A protein has these predicted regions:
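Structural signature of extracellular appendage/secretion-system components
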Residues: 1-461
Length: 461
């Protein structure tokens, strides 16, 4: 969030608010108009930087997922090869392949750190392994884990190629949510449902998948029906919160400069149109006015004739067209305003300065109508929303760190106890036993000689 790296992100929000306050004093002043453009660009840059940094964090985790899957497959191949070596060495019933067994045990230990496994050794010394409930090391091969890469995000999803068909996609983890595009493509809908009580919170690979998330968090995840998809993922939730905050600021300011209303046509169709009776205009007095935050390649209005009258119909956001959304990455400060600030809608249509904009902006900025998430019970304004993001993030971080420290300490204690038994080398212990036995024999002979000499001296006396 860059709170510890130079200027705070919150400063861009505060500076934007200060710019709007100055603008309200004299909206026709080009200096004040320029300040709005500059601070709006700074605000969007900061938002995009924070959002992009979180995306890079996800990409870094994504690469770790690929590395771990590659390592798991490598371990599987090595265990399979060691199985054959152990069988060959011990087939005569005379030798024990201790070195190979130690190497295999070490690999199985490492594998258990990546995912939930079940290992079973038969009478010939061959170990068969199930990974997340599926056959991994079998009698005649190791079943490799495959990776599905999503377009756009590049996110990897581990799956089982040997049991995946056109009719049935088999992800390695059935309790981790799939990227929405993949889930729709393969017809496999599943949600993240991991808990200690379910005994499925096992392995670093699953932890990485959950930490990365299934996709990038956007403002629409903050709705009541979608929030559960990001609730347990800190990165996606923070992305969604930043996206939601930026969107609400952009929409609020655009609705002030370019207010909309509805019109019902004679045929019953309802349109969202520019409120030409109440909108402001730029210095040129033309309609429609220019919005402050514009979607790239997507105009705010389309001029249409309805019932014999001219209207500026609002080009609404649609799911079918991603570029129609007011969201980070799609929006920039209107290039027409950046090129000519006097086009900013600061005038009434009679040519006088619209000082009423100041009250509208103040009301919109200070209005407490935002919740940090659907479970929040106290509303806040724009700046209060950001404070809640930081507080929420800090609280989660503190909880996760305490939990991590506790589990790390517990794991270390268990591993120490285990190594007291399993970590002992049989060859080393056998060497010590032989050494101690030889020392005992030498000591025994020395005592016997002394005893005999003492007895002889007594007899001579």
């Amino acid at each position: 969030m860059q709170e510890m790296n130079g200027a705070e992100f919150k400063e861009s929000i505060s500076e934007l608010w200060q710019a709007f306050q100055e603008y309200g004093k004299d909206p026709t002043n080009s200096t004040n108009q320029n300040l709005i453009i500059q601070k709006s660009e700074l605000f969007l840059t900061r938002c995009n930087t924070v959002y992009s940094d979180l995306q890079k964090y996800q990409s870094n985790i994504n690469l770790q997922i690929k590395d771990q899957v590659d390592r798991i497959n490598e371990i599987g191949d090595k265990i399979y090869a060691l199985n054959l070596e152990i069988q060959k060495t011990e087939s005569g019933g005379v030798e024990t392949a201790m070195t190979a067994r130690d190497a295999r045990d070490s690999l199985i230990d490492e594998l258990a750190g990546y995912a939930k496994i079940e290992a079973e050794e038969d009478s010939t010394g061959y170990v068969r392994i199930k990974l997340e409930g599926q056959q991994f090391v079998q009698d005649n091969k190791c079943n490799h884990i495959g990776l599905t890469e999503e377009k756009g995000t590049g996110f990897y999803t581990p799956y089982w190629p040997h049991i995946t068909t056109q009719e049935s996609y088999m992800p390695v983890f059935s309790d981790v949510a799939l990227p929405s595009a993949l889930a729709e493509r393969v017809g496999c809908t599943q949600t993240t449902n991991i808990a200690t009580s379910l005994n499925n919170d096992i392995g670093s690979l699953k932890a990485l998948l959950v930490s990365r998330g299934s996709e990038y968090g956007t403002y629409d995840f903050m709705s009541e029906e979608n929030y559960s998809e990001v609730e347990d993922n800190v990165v996606m939730e923070t992305q969604a919160e930043i996206s939601y905050l930026a969107r609400n600021i952009m929409m609020a300011m655009n609705d002030i400069f370019c207010p909309n209303t509805t019109y019902t046509a004679a045929d019953g169709t309802t349109y969202t149109v520019l409120d030409t009776a109440n909108c402001s205009v730029g210095a040129d007095g033309s309609l429609p006015p220019h919005e402050l935050f514009a979607r790239e390649g997507y105009d705010r209005y389309t001029q249409m004739e309805i019932d014999g009258k001219q209207f500026y119909v609002y080009n609404d956001e649609t799911k079918a067209n991603n570029s129609s959304w007011y969201k980070l990455g799609n929006v920039s400060v209107n290039p027409k305003l950046a090129a000519q600030v006097t086009l900013m809608p600061s005038y009434k249509q009679d040519g006088s300065a619209n000082y009423g904009l100041a009250d509208q902006i103040t009301k919109a900025w200070s209005a407490e109508n935002l919740y940090i998430n659907p479970k929040d019970t106290s509303k806040c304004n724009f700046e209060g929303y950001y404070d809640k993001i930081i507080s929420h993030l800090g609280t989660n971080g503190s909880i996760y760190k305490a939990s991590s420290d506790t589990m790390t300490s517990t794991a270390a204690a268990i591993d120490n106890q285990r190594n007291q038994i399993m970590g002992v080398s049989s060859d080393e212990e056998l060497t010590n036993m032989i050494k101690y036995q030889s020392a005992y024999n030498a000591s025994s002979r020395f005592i016997t000689v002394i005893s005999q000499m003492t007895e002889l001296i007594v007899q001579l006396i």
